[in-house]
Amino acid sequence: DNVKWNASADWRTIYPYVLADTLGGDRNTERYTFQGGCATRLGHWTIGEELTFRAEHEWATHDPRMRAIVTDLNARIGVGRTLLHHHFALGGTLSLYKQTNSVEFYREEGKIPEYQMMGLGNWYERFSGTNNSAYYKAVGGGMDVGGRPSAGRGGLLFSASYNYTPYKRILSSLNALPITQLYVTQWQGRLGWKVRM
C-alpha cells in the first residue's frame, strides 16, 4: 500500500491501530489464496457453500525488519428458493482473521522506538518504545438477503447485507494484553425494478 509510518500488514483492514516507526522501508510480500464452493439443488430449494482462504507473509530485509503473517478465512452458506415468480435467497458468513507482526533490529547502531498507533497521528505512549510485536485477531459474521424476478419477468429486485467484525490488537510480550479494539460494521442495501423484456 506504500503507506508511511506502518510496520503492519493489511493496513486497510486494521488502520489506524498499526505498529509504526520513523524509518519504514521497502517490503517483500508473498500471498497465497484459494477459493471453492458448490451448490446443490433439493426440489425447489438451492443450498450453496463457499470457502475462501488467504495467507500472506510480509517482511523487510533491512532495519527495521518488520515481519507479518496473516491468515484470513471466510465461510459462507446460503439457501435460495423460487416463489411467486421470484428468486429469494438468504445467506450467512463467518470470518476468522489473525495477524502476527513484529519488528527486529540487527544493525550495530541500535534500535529506534516502535509506536503503537492510535489514529490521527497519536500513539499509545505507555506501550510504545520497546513493545515491538503485536498480534491482531477477529471473529466476525454477517448475513444477507436478496430477491429478483425470474428470467423473462419484471418486478422488484432488492438486496441487503450486514457484516460485523471486531479486530483486537494484543501485545504478546505483556501476557496477551489487548490494548485496542476496532469495530467494523458494514450495511449495504439495493432496491430496483426490473422491466419485463
Protein language model annotation of sequence segments:
Residues 1, 40-44, 53-59, 94-98, ...:
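Transmembrane beta-strands of outer-membrane beta-barrel pores
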Residues 28-34, 64-73, 137-143, 183-189:
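Residues that define the transmembrane beta-barrel architecture of outer-membrane proteins
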Residues 48-54, 89-95, 146, 157-165, ...:
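Transmembrane beta-strands of outer-membrane beta-barrel proteins
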Residues 43-49, 84-90, 152-158, 197:
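Outer-envelope beta-barrel architecture signal
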Residues 2-9, 59-66, 101-108, 168-177:
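Outer-membrane beta-barrel translocator domains and adjoining extracellular loop/strand segments
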Residues 4-19, 109-127:
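Surface-exposed loop/turn segments flanking beta-strands in extracellular/periplasmic regions
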Residues 18-24, 59-65, 129-134, 171-181:
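Extracellular loop and loop/strand-boundary signature of outer-membrane beta-barrel proteins
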Residues 34-40, 75-81, 143-151, 189-197:
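Residues on the lipid-exposed face of transmembrane beta-strands in outer-membrane beta-barrel proteins
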